[in-house]
């Protein structure tokens, strides 16, 4: 399945900030370090030079990715019409059949962060939740079988 191109405004700004940091701050520092290491002479056994060149390639790869990705991403802002229903950017409190609750935020694949309970819009749980309302029951297929979740709360960061 292809990655969706949706992102929250905060997510887009974070990626843009990362791009600017890499291009304007990190890359010039690493370029200078590589230049200094190259001036020391033999480059074949110069660990600083070799590491610096590797780091420069990593930065350039990430800069290319971010530049291309930021061009195609679609920012999805909060809309008051979304209230009461689950859409992109929503925080949702779910309850499983055992009564355990957990809160998730539906975000773009570029913002996916399990530690923050941010799930990708492309995930099975998020896809099953889209359009649901308070007290709806949702069946989600997982690798271990189907699970049933109940929508307890829906809210948006405005």
Swiss-Prot record:
Tell me which species this is from.
Answer: Haemophilus influenzae (strain ATCC 51907 / DSM 11121 / KW20 / Rd)
Query: Mind telling me which Pfam families this protein's record contains?
Result: GreA_GreB, GreA_GreB_N
Gene name of the encoded protein: greB
Stretches assigned to coiled coil: 53-75
Give the function comment from the record. Answer: Necessary for efficient RNA polymerase transcription elongation past template-encoded arresting sites. The arresting sites in DNA have the property of trapping a certain fraction of elongating RNA polymerases that pass through, resulting in locked ternary complexes. Cleavage of the nascent transcript by cleavage factors such as GreA or GreB allows the resumption of elongation from the new 3'terminus. GreB releases sequences of up to 9 nucleotides in length.
Entry-linked HAMAP family:
GreA_GreB (MF_00105), GreB (MF_00930)
| Gene Ontology terms, MF aspect | DNA binding; RNA polymerase binding
UniProt xrefs under SUPFAM superfamilies: FKBP-like (SSF54534), GreA transcript cleavage protein, N-terminal domain (SSF46557)
Q: Which GO terms describe its biological process?
A: DNA-templated transcription elongation; regulation of DNA-templated transcription elongation
Sequence similarity: Belongs to the GreA/GreB family. GreB subfamily.
Which InterPro entries does this entry report, sorted A to Z?
GreA/GreB_C_sf, TF_GreA/GreB_CS, Tscrpt_elong_fac_GreA/B, Tscrpt_elong_fac_GreA/B_C, Tscrpt_elong_fac_GreA/B_fam, Tscrpt_elong_fac_GreA/B_N, Tscrpt_elong_fac_GreA/B_N_sf, Tscrpt_elong_fac_GreB
Protein known as: Transcription elongation factor GreB
């Amino acid at each position: 399945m292809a990655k969706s191109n949706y992102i929250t405004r905060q997510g887009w700004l974070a990626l843009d900030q990362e791009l600017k940091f890499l291009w304007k701050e990190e890359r010039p520092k690493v370029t200078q370090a590589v230049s200094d290491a190259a001036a020391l002479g033999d480059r074949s056994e110069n660990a600083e030079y070799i590491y610096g060149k590797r780091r420069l390639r990593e930065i350039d790869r990430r800069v290319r990715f971010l530049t291309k990705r930021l061009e195609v991403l679609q920012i999805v802002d909060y809309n008051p019409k979304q209230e009461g229903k689950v859409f992109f950017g929503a925080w949702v409190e779910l309850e499983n059949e055992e009564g355990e609750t957990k809160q998730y935020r539906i975000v773009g694949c570029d913002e996916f962060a399990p530690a923050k309970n941010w799930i990708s819009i492309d995930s099975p749980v998020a896809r099953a939740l889209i359009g649901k309302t308070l007290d709806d029951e949702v069946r989600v297929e997982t690798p271990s079988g189907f699970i049933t979740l109940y929508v307890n709360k829906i809210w948006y960061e405005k």
